[in-house]
């Protein structure tokens, strides 16, 4: 359950610092950091650490809880408890964790679950993960053929299924089978790496390609995206390039044939086999007859009747900006929505009504010409990959 009893004063907010130094921190995360009583963080670089301390001097580094004589699980338990102790003291605690704070991060989920079970307000704000960076740098859309993400050791230990027809992303390929912690792992300690290659070769064959990917931490770096065959990854000079922050991307086997549900297609009224457009379909061309026709029509396009532009002036815009970026303002709003709206100047009656109601349809509609609630379908920007037409 996301909602929790507000009877207890302490609260916990978990945010992500992203991958790239400082620049991946969201406005929402920065606002949470600035307004916290105390910030507990585990981040990947000194620049982000200094930025957090600049935004909130009452910040503590949890990285010191790691130890080379400790199991990582014990460290994660301690990290969670370090934050929970302060929540129980009635403090507004913010935990900042590298990447997305809920993706391959154990202490955040533990702390949130315990805080909620004890009646404290607790939530997680999203951040950018290594996988998000991988999708951007390698030009991959996971929806094109589906995508499965595994932690490398988990894949092996639990015999997770591999679907060669979909994208596969593997985390922590540089520490296969490792449960301990070291401040400086070397590639020759990744002694179980060949077990991972054996599993991949079983599913894809030795000549299938794998992209070794490392997202850049600083703006001075470029992403690392090196393509090797599974067989090449067994070579010592290649294996030595695999680090603790390495991620593998395994593309689908192009030889895998698509299986259509013809009964379902018939029920949808589709009489032909769906196609996948360029660039997801390597056999498609970027400028075929259909694409050329669509581009020709672009010159004479006019906004359709259902399109509603943003109002040129709206007092509601400034109010929503404050509510998004200032937690104390949001607290005032939640205490009494009607009183909050009545105390504002420059809003129309429709905008006040939308603010009190607070749902996305009414608010989105109040910002657009016409003031009427927005159809939920218009709020979803769906870029469909599979062509059914």
Curated annotation (Swiss-Prot):
Q: Which SUPFAM superfamilies match?
A: Tetrapyrrole methylase
PTM annotation (N-methylleucine): residues = 379
Q: Where is this region: Methyltransferase domain?
A: 1-253
**Enzyme Commission number(s) of this protein:** 2.1.1.-
**Could you tell me which residues carry N-methylthreonine?**
382
Residues where N-methylphenylalanine is found: 381, 383
Which pathway does the UniProt entry assign to this protein? Secondary metabolite biosynthesis
Record key words, sorted:
Methylation, Methyltransferase, S-adenosyl-L-methionine, Transferase
**Alphabetized Pfam families for the sequence:** TP_methylase
UniProt key word Methyltransferase:
yes
User: What positions constitute the catalytic site?
Assistant: 72, 76, 98
Question: Where are the N-methylisoleucine residues found in this chain?
Answer: 384-385
Self-association state and partner proteins as the record states: Homodimer.
Question: What family does this chain come from, according to its entry?
Answer: In the N-terminal section; belongs to the precorrin methyltransferase family.
Q: What is known of its domains?
A: Within the homodimer, the clasp domain wraps around the adjacent subunit to position the core peptide into the other subunit's active site for iterative intermolecular methylation.
What is this protein's name?
Methyltransferase/ribosomally synthesized type I borosin cyclic peptide precursor cmiMA
User: Can you name the source organism?
Assistant: Coprinellus micaceus
Q: What is the lineage of its organism?
A: Eukaryota, Fungi, Dikarya, Basidiomycota, Agaricomycotina
**Which gene name belongs to this protein?**
cmiMA
